[in-house]
Amino acid sequence: MKVHNEAAVEAQITELRTITRLQEQCRALQIQGVKEKTAQNKATMGILRSNLRRGAQDWALAKKHDQWTISKACGKDTSMRLAHGRSTLEVAREKLRKYVFDRVNTHNILIHLVRRRGQKLESLQLELASLRNQPDATKDELRQLQIIRQLENNIEKTVIKITTSQNIHTLYKVLLDYLKKVLAEYPTELDKLQNLVANYCSELSDMTVMSQDAMMITDEVKRNMRQGEATFIEERRARENRLNQQKKLIDKIHTKETSEKYRRGRRDLDFPSNLMTMENVKVKKRKTSVADIQYQTKVTTLVERVKSAVQCSHLWDIAGRFLAQKNTEENLELQMEDCEERRTQLEALMKKLELEEAVLKFHQTPSAVGFNSIQKKMKNMLEEEEARLKQAQNNMNKGQQLLLVIQTGIDNLYIRLIGITLPTFQKEIAVSNTLDVYGKLDYCEGKLIYLAERMQTLSRNEEVDTKVRDTLESSTLKEKHNTRITFEDPEEDMIETFQFADVDHSYVPSRAEIKKQAQQLIEAKLKGAKKKKK
């Protein structure tokens, strides 16, 4: 079996070798054929290139010859030469042939006209000669000729009169038929006019009712606006009185603080050792880690970004601003829906009125003049009512803006006072998300009364005051909106923003500058006291 397998393998190997030899021979033959074909193609390419060059030269020569022939055919006519310069010889030849044929046709027509006129001239000359050769007529013949001409003229006049009378007779018949038809149609038109009169009367009554309703609505809106303005002015005056009282209290506190600072400065000068120890303690407290400083800078940058995005000067105003924006969005969406409904109603009314106007235009009668005058009056009344409605809408928009501003201020106060807890013996209002404006006002009023009472009852402590002042100054030192606040008169502007922004961009000194000024004053006073002692 092994010998048989080896023989079969050797036979297969020999067959494969013969196949590979044949494939190599075929490949060599293919390569030779390809080389021969490439050589033939190169030769044909050279021949074709030479033929192309010759053809291009022949084409250029033919073009030049065509241009020369066109210029020779056009002669001195530059416009024709420019018109046919870029075209081929065949196109130029066809155009010139058309031009020549047109000129030949016009020439033939003119020759024909000249011949006809010559024939007419010859006939007229012959008539002249015949008339000159005739003998002169007698008086009787002349009279007869005049009578004949008069009779011919009279006959023509009578014929014209007869034709005109016939035309008038037919016209009168047509008019009679038309008038009969119109008389037959008049009763139906009278019925239509009566119906139109009834419809117009009903529309007039409806329009009067509409105008009266609009007047009533505008009067009610004006009353509500006046009442709202009066209540707003009273509330604003009350708020301003409270703010003035608080301002007076703050001024008193500031005066006390300055006096206490002066006393402390004197004590520090009397006891320098105590001052050194206190300064060392403060320096130790101020030494903070680098991580805390980096965290504080990150927090401040984030807060500044939020403030710049929301356009608020305080952190506690951001939530109020978002709530105000939500309220304004909801109100604007409601207004948009109302406006769309009104627009659809007005479009339907406009279509109806346009249809009625078209009907009236195409069916106007002498009795419709009165309706036109009434319609003009009604249009004027409608324009006046629309102007009043626009004024009322403007007033309503102003009132809505004012209400939105008031709501934002109340929301800001509510958010500021929400963290203050009342004592147990006082009834605290439950905080809920569904509080209306009046509920928020009551809540803020209770908290503010509690805070005012607590401020009056609290005893002043120097250390606590200094700590609070230091924290406030350090927190508001780097703020851009760290400016003084001025209170405007109530008569200047009826709208209050409740956002105590940059009203008076006055200079606010820092804590270091205040310390320097205080030390300078203390040193000057001590020098004066030492000089007096000496």
Curated annotation (Swiss-Prot):
Q: Which domain of life is it from?
A: Eukaryota
In its UniProt entry, what is this protein called?
Answer: Coiled-coil domain-containing protein 183
UniProt key word Coiled coil = yes
Q: Does the keyword Coiled coil apply?
A: yes
Q: Where in this chain does the entry annotate a coiled-coil region?
A: 10-54, 136-209, 321-406
* The entry's keywords: Coiled coil
UniProt lists the gene as Ccdc183
Annotated organism of origin: Mus musculus (Mouse)
